[in-house]
Amino acid sequence: MERTTNFNAGPAALPLEVLQKAQKEFIDFNESGMSVMELSHRSKEYEAVHQKAKSLLIELMGIPEDYDILFLQGGASLQFSMLPMNFLTPEKTAHFVMTGAWSEKALAETKLFGNTSITATSETDNYSYIPEVDLTDVKDGAYLHITSNNTIFGTQWQEFPNSPIPLVADMSSDILSRKIDVSKFDVIYGGAQKNLGPSGVTVVIMKKSWLQNENANVPKILKYSTHVKADSLYNTPPTFAIYMLSLVLEWLKENGGVEAVEQRNEQKAQVLYSCIDESNGFYKGHARKDSRSRMNVTFTLRDDELTKTFVQKAKDAKMIGLGGHRSVGGCRASIYNAVSLEDCEKLAAFMKKFQQENE
């Protein structure tokens, strides 16, 4: 079977080796006589999967000992509510850097629980860049929230701010795509369905000391401390999604770890951005060059009809997921960790040929 090249924004491409291993273990996991999907979350077989996923995250990301790792449900969208529910108090303000739709959603949820402030925004330029951040007025804030990569607009933080208050990052779309200093953040969270595995599990990495500030009057299942104490087993976890997460992390380790994948991601992005920049305006990048994402390459063509033709012809060539979001229009190539350099070279060759045929 010829595999389709998957440029979807999420759920996104998974490594073929991971899919093949999951296929092999789907019926009989480790000679247990059961599918991995049938394992009790209290069994020793699943416990090994659970702990393996945690230990691989610690190893690959260099997570310090003073952090907890949680596997939760509800997607990153639930974190938009859980964070202020647990950590925003009446006398404090949650500060936001607005860089796209996901920042807007996080801000909207936080407003339901307390005071918020927009520290910086690039909304007036349709979120085409990461704004400069002045942190002089946030010293008494509850936390500063950022979105590390913006899938819709194709922008990404190149350097993270040195925040005088707790720094919280939604890293759903670029976690483990590059080396970061975890110790700069009090909370990192992200849905798995872009770089970590299939949809269904949300990874939360939280500084242990931050739990001391947790609000008391919160439903038990929505308290972070509940899940820390239960090792993410307070209720039945998404066992298959966590199993797949462990396989993806294992694949990443076997392929050189984060340092190697970061180099590959830079090469992949450069192939596509060079194609855009050398097209004499046939393709126009949405993101400013100093804010370009290595995960989501966004670009427009001269009109909607040409864009539709581009997307359809790409689909005919077994490349899917290239339609842009309505906020930007045009096209978007999501090139997460599992998308290969060869996949990006195939797309670039298609783009050059399409330009020659339609100029």
From Swiss-Prot:
Top-level class of the enzyme under EC nomenclature: transferase
Compartments in which it is found: Cytoplasm
Cofactor(s) it depends on: pyridoxal 5'-phosphate
Family of the protein in this entry: Belongs to the class-V pyridoxal-phosphate-dependent aminotransferase family. SerC subfamily.
Keyword Phosphoprotein applies: no
Main localization (coarse): cytoplasm
Keywords: Amino-acid biosynthesis, Aminotransferase, Cytoplasm, Pyridoxal phosphate, Serine biosynthesis, Transferase
UniProt GO MF annotations: O-phospho-L-serine:2-oxoglutarate aminotransferase activity; pyridoxal phosphate binding
Annotated NCBIfam families: PRK05355.1, serC_1
Superkingdom of this protein's organism: Bacteria
Source organism per UniProt: Bacillus subtilis (strain 168)
Matching Gene3D superfamilies: Aspartate Aminotransferase, domain 1, Type I PLP-dependent aspartate aminotransferase-like (Major domain)
Name used for this protein in its record: Phosphoserine aminotransferase
